[in-house]
Amino acid sequence: MTAIVDIIGREILDSRGNPTVEVDVVLEDGSVGRAAVPSGASTGAHEAVELRDGDKSRYLGKGVLKAVEAVNGELFDALGGMDAEAQVQIDQTMIELDGTPNKSRLGANAILGVSLAVAKAAASSYDLPLYRYVGGTSARTLPVPMMNIINGGAHADNPIDFQEFMIMPAGAASFSEALRCGSEIFHTLKGELKKAGHNTNVGDEGGFAPNLPSADAALDFVVSAIGKAGYKAGEDVMIALDPASTEFFKNGKYVYEAEGRSLGPQEQAKYLADLVARYPIVSIEDGMAEDDIEGWKAITGLIGDKCQLVGDDLFVTNVTRLYDGIKNGYANSILIKVNQIGTLTETLAAVEMAHKAGYTAVMSHRSGETEDSTIADLAVATNCGQIKTGSLARADRTSKYNQLLRIEQELGTQAHFAGKAALKAFR
């Protein structure tokens, strides 16, 4: 009944107008699973490899026909006839077939598309929602959203060096209330920016991209918008940052071009600690560069007991890199991006390792997204308690929020909103 009879790959467009891979997996009973693969802008050096064609005459070299060919050829040949329920075996077969440590031969974008589509097809065969199929009967926790309302860095054409300024409505009573709160703050912020003479165009993830001179200026706007929307910063709504520090770490220094200054690793750690002291910041992602391990140890020592320190480029959803952080005591949280590692099995293993070590896990989108809402289901399936999926604009972002609304409604009285308990600062 759940044997794989067909795998169909195709080239589609992501939210930035770049090609990406979409995969359909068809089972013997007629069930179909479809998955589209996201793509990052600020990518970690240690991520699994996204295979691009490199043909400059087509999509400026960003085509993914080689990855699609791998899906329709080698991967189907290897997986045809296998039971879609055998997720671990299927993922392991693809990893071994690729034969490289970073999935560079067949492409993580090809392998991930198949991996997620297989799980969705199997869930469909059992007439189960994906979160229930993957997470079982214990999957009922709706995550606190990290809503990116001001964009900078690689996600916007403005002077701000930090990549994301986010709000977390952790004080809400339910996911739907948290979403409403975020929406109200988003629209209030738009009015405040417009009133101050800033443009209100949005960046890749739907947040505003004003020409502000510093992180402090952006944070002041965020705190003001929270208050003017009728909420209390630090009580109803918290702030999260993603500096994406690897992007401006040059020759051992954190170079703030817009502010005309450079900081060493110890100075960077102290600067972030100062921001946490002055603003209701409860989470910082990639506050230090991916290979600045001494910097990571410094910031963990300074504020690791009161602030969530999330490793994105640092850990790249990889259990080997995560284990090193756990063993050596740096960071206290991991960002989970399915395309950083390339299979569902490895993604779930990273969440499990984090939770066992007392680290938090944050399910995350990429800046190049599609209408695919798989990560919403995975956030609930893993009970990770937090999701990062952009702003309250652009359908590629709201598709995930809308799926979580559906899940919350479907769970009814069983639904549990993670709230403040999901955050290090309130434990």
From Swiss-Prot:
Sum up the protein's function in the record's words: Catalyzes the reversible conversion of 2-phosphoglycerate (2-PG) into phosphoenolpyruvate (PEP). It is essential for the degradation of carbohydrates via glycolysis.
Recorded E.C. number(s)?
A: 4.2.1.11
Protein localization: Cytoplasm; Secreted; Cell surface
* Keywords from the UniProt entry: Cytoplasm, Glycolysis, Lyase, Magnesium, Metal-binding, Secreted
The protein's annotated pathway: Carbohydrate degradation; glycolysis; pyruvate from D-glyceraldehyde 3-phosphate: step 4/5
Identify the PANTHER family for this entry: ENOLASE (PTHR11902:SF1)
- Which cofactors? Mg(2+)
The residues forming the signal peptide are none
Residues that bind Mg(2+), according to the entry?
Answer: 242, 285, 312
- Kindly give the HAMAP family that the UniProt entry links to this protein: Enolase
Provide the protein name. Enolase
Q: Which GO terms describe its biological process?
A: glycolytic process
Tell me the active site.
205 (proton donor), 337 (proton acceptor)
Family from the record: Belongs to the enolase family.
Instruction: Enumerate the CDD domains for this protein.
Output: enolase
Query: Bound how, and how many: what does the cofactor note say?
Result: Binds a second Mg(2+) ion via substrate during catalysis.
Q: What is its main location?
A: cytoplasm
